[in-house]
Amino acid sequence: MSQRDTLVHLFAGGCGGTVGAILTCPLEVVKTRLQSSSVTFYISEVQLSTVNGASVARMAPPGPLHCLKLILEKEGPRSLFRGLGPNLVGVAPSRAIYFAAYSTSKEKLNNVFDPDSTQVHMLSAGLAGFTAITATNPIWLIKTRLQLDARNRGERRMSAFECVRRVYQSDGLRGFYRGMSASYAGISETVIHFVIYESIKRKLIEHKANSNMDDEDESVKDASDFVGMMLAAATSKTCATSIAYPHEVIRTRLREEGSKYRSFFQTLNMVFREEGYRALYRGLTTHLVRQIPNTAIMMCTYELVVYLLNG
């Protein structure tokens, strides 16, 4: 891969990540609130009837719409964009590093394994994920802390710089890498995602080659390609997210300020014992609703920018 090709993939990946982050930020905030232990702040009591006819109170976490309503009522609409600054600062380099590492790894591994085989896509996605996570974890920790900083209307909100200072004062440099073990566990999601995506993409290309699309108008072919890539990205991400979601909850818990959670397996065990297995999937619906359009937008923007720059 030439230096120009690497720069094209860097720029395209950054553009895709930035556009997706801006459009889906409110859903990201709601998801993070639902994943955290601070969701207990919003928990309400539900009256349940027992066998003897008596009633007992059970604590029930809010659903996505209820959480969204509470954020709007207590904190205002601006809170739905908490953490957008660090997100924009981090998403471009993160996606750029990821796609550049993915493309470079795939080119190298094609010389070792069968070109464009499943092994190539899995290893390339894993190496790219590891590289991006290691480089950008401090940014995502700050983003999570800001999203969890619930303040009522009129109260002074914590800035990104203040958050950085507090993390350093309490935990030092190591504090910026909290939750990284859960992110490494989440590489499995990335691997599954890209294996499915590349498989669907290859099938679409084969279908196009075997069809009579040459007789169609150019605009019709472009529209068909766009829809195909959107569906490929959405399908692959939905499957991957549903399988690997618990690591998202563990990562958010590890990044909480003053957290009682210390390591990946300790957090996994504590959440399971104290809140049950359902807590490991809290926020999944919101996550899927956000990830499907976010990933589709990101991947299509990436493909479009690469196509335009390569002429």
UniProtKB/Swiss-Prot annotation:
Solcar repeats lie at residues 4-108, 116-203, 224-308. InterPro entries: Mit_carrier, Mitochondrial_sb/sol_carrier, Mt_carrier_dom_sf, SLC25A33/36-like. GO terms for biological process: mitochondrial genome maintenance; pyrimidine nucleotide import into mitochondrion. One of its GO terms (cellular component) is mitochondrial inner membrane. It comes from the Eukaryota. Its main location: mitochondrion. It is a multi-pass membrane protein. PROSITE patterns: SOLCAR. Signal peptide: none annotated. This is Solute carrier family 25 member 36-A. It comes from Danio rerio. The lineage of its organism: Eukaryota, Metazoa, Chordata, Craniata, Vertebrata.
